[in-house]
Design a protein with these regions (language model features):
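Bacterial signal peptide processing site
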Residues: 12-15
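C-terminal motif of bacterial Sec signal peptides marking the signal peptidase cleavage site
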Residues: 7-10
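A short, amphipathic beta-strand motif
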Residues: 27-35, 203-209
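Extracellular distal adhesion/interaction modules in secreted or cell-surface proteins
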Residues: 21-27, 278
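Extracellular beta-sheet/turn segments enriched in Thr/Pro/Gly and aliphatic residues
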Residues: 130-197, 206-208, 319-355
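Tryptophan-paired
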Residues: 50-134, 193-196, 202-331
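Sec-dependent N-terminal signal peptides
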Residues: 1-5
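Short amphipathic, basic-aromatic surface patches that mediate peripheral association
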Residues: 17-19, 30-58
Length: 355
């Protein structure tokens, strides 16, 4: 029997795998999953933002900064641009203007995107308001697919669907922040401290084969569109895609694998009636939901047939989140998945034979 054990960044252990009998050459094979949640960065926290990036070489990179200020009436007051590289958090003095002294404003900032005239198309829109700015969204390119969230090219679109820029610096992630209820100083000069956060979630897979070989793996059902500033909801017209399988070289199929993926936030209804890890299966996913999941394909020692193990991601940072499968931006998810022969003949609905 095969066992797949999984751990996410949080803190308790759950070794409740149940297995599915499958006739396979020499007898019954059963596959099982164990989920141990571990340490997650909770929503609302903004610590350690510089380590949560695409490439270690560029992990501190913040440049090409656009800062847009909106007044209390929701209309744009000013747009600032700086091409220089800065630390995170970044403190700057904004000359908003003495005519706005005492006014309460909202400040948006987006980094590692475009150049000075990136918002030129928006400048010509008569209803260029704070509401419209909240509709800015990132999209993956049609040619690169969802893997371009972590590499390749992404696109920035306006709420109305205008392509504002192509983001070519894949190793420096799109970083954003938003400051609300900022009061403009009497002289119009207002100091703002911008703490940027990455515009995607990092999912790290640790795959540990025991008495089996891992042939390939991938992350599936990833949103292709994500709001930049309006967090906590999917873009209404969102589509979903799968990262292509990562093929494991034959010499490494029995070794531990560690691989990071970058995805957009993904909000879905909770898993129906889930009380244990094995309930986080396809049969319990609400109709119309598109939760993100990982697929692992392996071959047990002594067999030739391939088996697929699917686990739904998100939540599981504690046992009381067992029904929760949203992928949120301000968390890092790390999963430890142990796949091994077990032999007790019980069944796991997350495992199937590859036909």
């Amino acid at each position: 029997m095969i066992v797949a054990g999984m751990m996410t960044t949080s803190c308790s252990s759950d070794n409740d795998g149940v297995e599915q009998q499958t006739n396979n050459q020499t007898g019954v094979i059963a596959l099982k999953a164990e989920v141990v949640p571990m340490n997650t960065l909770q929503e609302g926290e903004r610590t350690d933002t510089r380590s949560r990036v695409i490439s270690a070489e560029y992990e501190n990179t913040i440049n090409n900064i656009h800062i847009v200020v909106f007044g209390s009436d929701g209309k744009k007051i000013k747009h600032f641009y700086s091409p220089m590289y800065v630390d995170n958090p970044y403190t700057t003095l904004l000359n908003i203007g003495s005519s706005h002294a005492g006014e309460t404003v909202t400040i948006y900032a987006i980094a590692n995107v475009g150049d000075a005239d990136m918002f030129e198309n928006l400048e010509n829109v008569t209803d260029y308001t704070q509401t419209a700015f909240e509709g800015l969204n990132l999209r993956v390119s049609a040619t690169d697919g969802v893997q371009s969230i972590g590499q390749g090219t992404q696109l920035l679109y306006s709420q109305a669907g205008t392509n504002l820029t192509t983001i070519n610096n894949a190793e420096a992630p799109v970083m954003v922040t938003k400051l609300e209820n900022v009061t403009v100083a009497n002289n119009g000069l207002t100091r703002a401290t911008l703490s940027f956060t990455r515009q995607n979630t990092k999912i790290t897979l640790n795959l540990i084969p025991q008495k089996m070989k891992i042939v390939k793996y991938r992350v599936c059902s990833i949103p292709k569109i994500s709001y930049v500033f309006s967090k906590g909801t999917n873009v209404p017209e969102v589509e979903y895609g799968d990262i292509p399988y990562v093929e494991v070289p034959a010499a490494d199929q029995s070794k531990q694998i560690k691989q990071a993926f970058y995805v957009y936030e993904n909000y879905n209804e909770n898993i129906v009636g889930a009380v244990k890890q094995t309930d986080r299966c396809e049969a319990n996913i609400p109709n119309g939901a598109h939760p993100t999941y990982v697929e692992i394909v392996g071959i047990p020692d002594g067999f030739t047939d391939q088996y697929l193990y699917r686990v739904y991601l998100g939540g599981v940072s504690s046992q009381n989140e067992i029904q929760y499968h949203k992928i949120t931006l301000l968390r890092n998810y790390e999963y430890y998945v142990t796949v091994k022969l077990a032999g007790d003949g019980t069944g796991d609905p997350r495992v199937s034979k590859v036909e």
